[in-house]
């Protein structure tokens, strides 16, 4: 009975503190907040298969005083968010992933949507955008390894092309073919930018034209050039690529400044993730005393990201049985910590980073009921 009263007092104290704390903060318009969140970590970094961004939006206008952070949005977590007067829930995992054909009270995910809309609470999910971000989940996971240098295993592409257009077209025009007239005609095509420079080929003065153009404009450019066989025969068409980003991407390949034993690395990981147990598969020929210099890691489910990466150790939340066997056969040890255990601890760092990024304009709180559904007993 006494313990129940203590828990009630503690819960009441937290709620009172939350209300006092939130009253000291101002509000942000939802659209302005979403723009700031995208500035913090662009949604363009997310994988193409993912469902990220604003998933549930109350009718506008909608202002946010309290941003509620959770790894998984369950019904228990939703109840907590409502009790704490959340205006927007940032759920790392998207609670809406597969399309919904109806919104009824039948399934728990449908009920989440209903309760959010009834209580004017938005739901936002960054998921793999935060996996890829330089200050994101995987970088946080790497902090537990010790002093190391790291790089993405699969670098992300920049969200934009460094120049206008998706293609470059180059061809030469002789001075007898009136370069100015050709340039003028090309500039009339929407989505084309033209540069030119002089060149001499086979003792003939020429103007080398270079165009950057969109995919749609490319068809019109080719149609124009094909009208003049001399142009068309000397044409080169290049497909432009978005550059890879140095510090952004999926997974991390971490090289320790100093090698440590596998046993030491296990203890570091358990300490960082606040876990008493992890699952270990020893690589063929390896022991707990084997040195670890290179660690490949991926928060959550890492099979597809880690596969084929040369390392002493794989660290992730979960992998399939056969992928573990495959890694072990190559002498790579594997540590599995359960899916969300490799992600949830990041939220504390995220709260501090968002407080600074948003200039302390709103109240940001962490879920106290969010937890991994699996327990070792």
From Swiss-Prot:
Q: Does the keyword Cytoplasm apply?
A: yes
InterPro entries annotated for this entry? DUF34/NIF3, DUF34/NIF3_animal, DUF34/NIF3_sf
Report the subcellular localization: Cytoplasm; Nucleus
Gene Ontology, cellular component aspect: cytoplasm; mitochondrion; nucleus
Pfam short name (any one): DUF34_NIF3
* UniProt key word Acetylation: yes
Phosphoserine carried by residues: 259
> What subunit structure does UniProt give?
Homodimer. Interacts with COPS2. Interacts with THOC7.
Similarity section: Belongs to the GTP cyclohydrolase I type 2/NIF3 family.
Name of the protein in its database record = NIF3-like protein 1
- Which source organism does the UniProt entry give? Bos taurus (Bovine)
């Amino acid at each position: 009975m006494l313990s129940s009263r203590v828990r009630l007092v503690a819960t009441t104290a937290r709620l009172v503190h939350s209300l006092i704390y939130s009253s000291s903060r101002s509000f942000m318009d939802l659209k302005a907040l979403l723009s700031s969140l995208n500035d913090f970590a662009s949604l363009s970094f997310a994988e193409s298969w993912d469902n990220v961004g604003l998933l549930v939006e109350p009718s506008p206008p909608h202002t946010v005083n309290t941003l509620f952070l959770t790894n998984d949005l369950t019904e228990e977590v939703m109840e907590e968010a409502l009790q704490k007067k959340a205006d927007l829930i940032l759920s790392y995992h998207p609670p809406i992933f597969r399309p919904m054909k109806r919104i009824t009270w039948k399934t728990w995910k449908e009920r989440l949507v209903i309760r959010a809309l009834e209580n004017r609470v938005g739901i936002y999910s960054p998921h793999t955008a935060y996996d890829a971000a330089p200050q994101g989940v995987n970088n946080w996971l790497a902090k537990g390894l010790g002093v190391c240098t790291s790089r993405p295993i699969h670098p992300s592409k920049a969200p934009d092309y460094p120049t206008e257009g998706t293609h470059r077209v180059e061809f030469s025009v002789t001075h007898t073919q009136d370069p100015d007239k050709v340039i003028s005609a090309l500039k009339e095509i929407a989505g084309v930018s033209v540069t030119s420079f002089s060149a001499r080929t086979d003792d003939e003065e020429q103007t080398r034209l270079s165009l950057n153009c969109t995919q749609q404009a490319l068809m019109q450019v080719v149609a124009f050039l094909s009208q003049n066989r001399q142009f068309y025969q000397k044409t080169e068409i290049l497909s432009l690529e978005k550059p890879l980003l140095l510090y952004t991407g999926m997974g991390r390949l971490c090289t320790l400044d100093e090698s440590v034993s596998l046993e030491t690395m296990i203890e570091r990981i358990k300490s960082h993730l606040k876990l008493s147990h992890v699952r270990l598969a020893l690589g063929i020929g390896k022991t707990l005393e084997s040195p670890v210099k290179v660690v490949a890691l991926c928060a959550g489910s890492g099979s597809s990201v880690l596969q084929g990466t040369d390392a002493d150790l794989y660290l992730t939340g979960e992998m399939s049985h056969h992928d573990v066997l495959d890694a072990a056969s190559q002498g790579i040890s594997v540590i599995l910590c359960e899916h969300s255990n490799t992600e949830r601890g990041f939220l504390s760092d995220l709260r501090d980073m968002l407080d600074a990024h948003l200039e302390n304009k709103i109240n940001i709180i962490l879920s106290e009921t969010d937890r991994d559904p699996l327990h070792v007993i």
